[in-house]
């Protein structure tokens, strides 16, 4: 299966090029931020607080995403070619870095203002799931996050489409669970759990990335174990599961409609 010859540029204005990757990321941020804002105002969160929170989370989310990607893949850029670190428009963001950076910044700001974060992190799931789905589409245009070659009839695993499917499934799951009246905090941590499980099992197994712990590699089938993400998966699953149990067993747990 040949990789389609798609341009990474949506359009150009002279020397300025607008990338599909950036457009899809901006759409996910805008839609996710708008959803969080509308839902949180229904719970009487202050509008100015929410706007400031969204700005802080987006900024530190992008910073965290880029820094973790560079640290994991091209740490030499910091010394040999630091300009490359800032070329976000060319792609190269870590989903885990985005979540970590945005979460820590949001947690700090909420605690500083004395505001409960659990409902807000639940509402953020829409932006996270949509972002994973759309950014993987952007990866297709950038010709990155490729699957491994395989001797199956399709020639190469469509790793980006696997990521799109994971994001779509988790987005649908969010709205389904939202009808179940679960305690606040459950949506976010269950999302983290299932995202990591699905990505570690399905996407990473066929993605053409180095195996940091090469336990198994079948070049004919195009599958391999274990990538860096897969090595980290058990620890993330344990953390997410522990947080889920904590939310469900909290005697002071709260609910929202």
From Swiss-Prot:
UniProt-annotated binding residues for a 1,2-diacyl-sn-glycero-3-phospho-(1'-sn-glycerol): 136
GO terms of biological process kind: lipoprotein biosynthetic process
GO cellular component term, pick one: plasma membrane
Principal location class: membrane
Pathway(s) it belongs to: Protein modification; lipoprotein biosynthesis (diacylglyceryl transfer)
A Pfam family of this chain: LGT
Membrane topology classification: Multi-pass membrane protein
Chain ranges passing through the membrane: 13-33, 49-69, 88-108, 123-143, 152-172, 186-202, 223-243
Keywords: Cell membrane, Membrane, Transferase, Transmembrane, Transmembrane helix
Subcellular location: Cell membrane
InterPro entries linked: Lgt
EC number: 2.5.1.145
EC class of the enzyme, as a word: transferase
This protein's record includes keyword Protease: no
GO terms, molecular function: phosphatidylglycerol-prolipoprotein diacylglyceryl transferase activity
UniProt record similarity statement: Belongs to the Lgt family.
PANTHER family reported in the protein's UniProt record: PHOSPHATIDYLGLYCEROL--PROLIPOPROTEIN DIACYLGLYCERYL TRANSFERASE, PROLIPOPROTEIN DIACYLGLYCERYL TRANSFERASE
Biological function: Catalyzes the transfer of the diacylglyceryl group from phosphatidylglycerol to the sulfhydryl group of the N-terminal cysteine of a prolipoprotein, the first step in the formation of mature lipoproteins.
HAMAP family per the UniProt record, alphabetical: Lgt
Protein's name according to its UniProt entry: Phosphatidylglycerol--prolipoprotein diacylglyceryl transferase
Taxonomic classification: Bacteria, Bacillati, Bacillota, Clostridia, Thermoanaerobacterales
